[in-house]
């Protein structure tokens, strides 16, 4: 049997998952509520301001694609350390911003740091918490979204007493706490070169990988659009920066609850499609409300969007890991999905900015995301776990020969289904 090297001290690793998750979104969510002040001082305009969200998402995508190769060379510990240093440096650069270029550069550094984290942690979670992947991925997603809520609600309030750039820079401090915990308490495996087992197909060549990429991209395009433009949309309606920040916070809090709750509800069965369907319905209702009646029930629309986005993000991360039994291969699939998915998602804020430029309002941005959700609702129907082994080209006997139990998805193939793969 192949000995599986797992991180020792799963409790310490879980604390690290929480600390890192909290730090992955404030650098994005803090910008929207301050958009008016930033534009007034730096003169960015809507199109350039979109790059503060667009560029990090793009770099997260590129960085996550490179992470599996970096893991083979360096291992998870140096990569997570480098990720936290990049996040801390990116936030610290905002201490005394004097140009839009520097603001965009700081966002780029934070995006690269987030990329290394999101390409590394899913595989570690799959290996260290094999029986509790939905729970731990839910915790990770919830912390990420909870951190986003804190960024949106606290930053504009701190900016009342400090310069807005200094308020943004304060988010370097909680990153330092995560870095200290990583160095003090967490033990992780060393690098171990890895290649696909003989006969296993390259993940990038599989249609299923691209289906997951499309779903992930649509989900995170919606997140990018609301993070970038929800607060500015309500600022344009006469709301204050603090009120706009509260809306983003409501959205992020709903993301947090749903990001943890839906994976737990879905954990009883390997077929996560009913719960993903619920998440899509909530998003359709929320984005539809923002489009048709933005001032009728803004908090409700934000709660629906947040719950749908948070639940679908956590579920698609779990679904990707469900497809393969081996933690490293599952982590590579997750990295591939996130990499190309974030590149796709990066177009969302830019398209929304262009549509706003052409139409003069934000309704077209919400319509754009609704179109993506219609497409995603069709793609999700194909995520039948009974077909995971077949669509991934896995061989049950090959997995058993390596000392790995056949995954539930493979065992389930004894019962055939008429649902398309």
Each language-model region and where it sits:
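Cytoplasmic helix-loop-helix junction between adjacent transmembrane helices
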Residues: 106-142
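Intracellular juxtamembrane helix-capping segments at the cytosolic ends
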Residues: 116-129, 311-325
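Helix-loop-helix hairpin linking two adjacent transmembrane segments in secondary transporters
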Residues: 131-132, 138-187
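A late C-terminal transmembrane helix in Major Facilitator Superfamily
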Residues: 327-362, 369
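Helix-to-loop junctions at the C-terminal end of transmembrane segments
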Residues: 63-75, 258-271
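Helix-breaking motifs and short loop linkers at transmembrane-helix boundaries and internal kinks
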Residues: 43, 75, 96-101, 130, ...
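Conserved MFS/SLC helix-loop-helix module at the cytosolic interface between two early adjacent transmembrane helices
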Residues: 62-100
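Extracytoplasmic gate region of multi-pass secondary transporters
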Residues: 31-32, 207-249, 253-259
């Amino acid at each position: 049997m192949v000995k599986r090297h797992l991180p020792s001290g799963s409790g310490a690793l879980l604390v690290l998952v929480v600390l890192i998750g909290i730090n992955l979104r404030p650098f994005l969510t803090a910008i929207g509520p301050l958009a008016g002040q930033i534009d007034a001082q730096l003169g960015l305009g809507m199109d350039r301001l979109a790059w503060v969200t667009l560029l990090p998402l793009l770099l997260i995508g590129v960085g996550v694609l490179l992470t599996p190769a970096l893991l083979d060379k360096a291992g998870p510990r140096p990569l997570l350390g480098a990720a936290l240093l990049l996040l801390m440096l990116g936030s610290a650069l905002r201490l005394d911003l004097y140009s839009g270029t520097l603001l965009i550069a700081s966002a780029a550094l934070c995006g690269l740091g987030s990329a290394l984290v999101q390409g590394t942690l899913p595989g570690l979670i799959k290996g260290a918490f094999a029986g509790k992947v939905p729970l731990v991925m839910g915790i990770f997603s919830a912390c990420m979204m909870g951190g986003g809520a804190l960024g949106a609600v606290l930053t504009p309030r701190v900016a009342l007493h400090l310069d807005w750039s200094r308020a943004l820079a304060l988010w370097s401090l909680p990153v330092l706490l995560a870095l200290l915990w990583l160095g003090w308490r967490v033990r992780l495996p060393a690098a171990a070169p890895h290649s696909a087992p003989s006969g296993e197909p390259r993940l990038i060549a599989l249609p299923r990988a691209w289906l997951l990429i499309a779903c992930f991209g649509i989900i995170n395009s919606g997140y990018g659009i609301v993070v970038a433009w929800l607060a500015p949309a309500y600022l344009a309606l006469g709301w204050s920066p603090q009120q706009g920040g509260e809306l983003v916070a409501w959205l992020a809090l709903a993301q947090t609850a749903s990001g943890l709750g839906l994976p737990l509800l879905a954990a009883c069965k390997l077929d996560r499609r009913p719960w993903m369907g619920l998440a899509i319905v909530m998003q359709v209702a929320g984005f539809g409300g923002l489009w048709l009646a933005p001032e009728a029930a803004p908090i409700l629309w934000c709660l629906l969007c947040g719950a749908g986005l948070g639940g679908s993000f956590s579920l698609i991360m779990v679904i990707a890991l469900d497809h393969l039994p081996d933690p490293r291969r599952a982590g590579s699939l997750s990295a591939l999905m996130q990499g190309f998915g974030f590149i796709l998602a990066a177009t969302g804020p830019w398209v929304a900015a262009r549509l706003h430029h052409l139409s003069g309002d934000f309704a077209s941005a919400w319509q754009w995301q609704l179109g993506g959700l219609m497409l995603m609702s069709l793609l999700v129907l194909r995520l039948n776990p009974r077909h995971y082994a077949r669509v991934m080209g896995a061989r049950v006997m090959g997995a058993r020969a390596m000392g790995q139990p056949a995954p539930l998805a493979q065992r389930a193939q004894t019962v055939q289904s008429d649902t398309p793969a």
